[in-house]
Amino acid sequence: MKQIYILAIIVLASCNFSNQKEKSQEAWTFNEFVKLDSANPILSPDTSYRFNCPITNKPVQWQSKNVLNPTAFVKEGKVYLLYRAQDSAMTSRLGLAISEDGIHFIKQAAPVFYPAKDSFLKYEWKGGVEDPRIVQTPDSSYLLTYTSYDGKTARLCFATTRDLIHWEKRGPVLQSPKYINTWSKSGAVIVERVGSQMIAKKINGRYWMYFGDTNLFMAYSTDLLHWEALENAESKILVNVLSPRAGYFDSRLVEPGPFALYTKKGIVLIYNSSNAANNNDSTLPKFTYSAAQVLYDKSIPYKQIDRTKTYFIHPDKPYEKIGEVNEVCFVEGLVYFKDQWILYYGTADSKIAVAIANHKL
């Protein structure tokens, strides 16, 4: 009888520990994003939008093929959506759409950011400019990270603006000869929420950015303009801060989502992931893109504290499962607007959708 009693105590303690661990994880994550089926997809390709390409000097239907992978921010009580748009030749440019309610958007007629006859054309043509992520800087301007694609090599680049009309392209984030011609993508800057604004946050005297599209790495800067890759001092190779996991939904690759959010619990990063062809999550089709979350130490941004064991969003709608690339939910846009978090994501590399959470992270 005594042995049974002791066993019961052990089982109960184990259950309590498990519950405490689950509650601890719930305390730092974004929870319960609900897809807005009544409105989705909120943006779709449109052949009626024309733009005179400065490279070819010919009119192009700049968003006729696909719209996808948006970033978002709040300005003057409205939600601004910067989204990737592709023409029939698959060249990418960035369009702008504005919304009063965060759901229904009005597109601007012409792209606001695109390849031009400038010193960065060698990086951006003919593939274009892809997958934007935007944050506010402490001086109230905006920092945009994006992927330039010359048709062979993708490079993580950045630009700055004060008015979203006049942009100053700054070139590749990683300027050193060691990295400038290597493949890099997807820069998510660490920010702190001030009201509805997401402002780049200094930690230990540096700004930080997560990047990569296989594993995650980091770059740092003292001024948001000059960036250095975080390297191992001994091996001189990039410090790997997040990797795929065999047997999981994120077994093939991991890639940053929107900005990384500085909170009391730590730095919360939503990340995109892909399911491998084998040694994967067998409940999902191979190569499925879904999104999950990881927590880093708020004082040591490369130190992982926790990581969710499953995705919080994955393709289960027709427009997410069938498109330019099947089985894709790719998260890049996040705003805090009217007391709720609104998440914007690309669907099957073809359209854009929205999900909403009331969680007060």
Q: Where would I find each of the regions flagged by the language model?
A:
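Sec-dependent N-terminal signal peptides
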Residues: I4-A13
